[in-house]
Amino acid sequence: MTDNELLTIMRKEKIEPCYYKIYGVGGPIFEVVYHLEHKGNKYRLLITERAEKIYDKDFDTEDEACKNFLMEMSDVYPELKKYI
């Protein structure tokens, strides 16, 4: 899975962009935000609550990072589970 595929899923499922940031694409920061970042040769998933990190994990591949992003968000948006 790639970032573009992940963005397509988020839009298809009508997940408001204010709750996520994928490589800088997303809305303003709300209470809980899921961030997908690309740093060097690693991919990072951060989850922040009120601008405080509550989850921070690095991945070797974009596919792993995107799937983990969906897995974490599926706790709040169960409709995302079908993409994992």
Segments from the language model and where they lie:
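Negatively charged, low-complexity tracts enriched in Asp/Glu with abundant Ser/Thr
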Residues: 1-28, 83
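Phosphoinositide-binding peripheral membrane targeting modules
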Residues: 57
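A short, charged, amphipathic alpha-helix used as a generic interaction element across diverse proteins
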Residues: 60-75
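Short aromatic-glycine-(Arg/Gly/Cys) micro-motifs in beta-strand/loop hairpins
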Residues: 27-54, 72
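Intrinsically disordered, low-complexity charged/polar segments
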Residues: 76-84
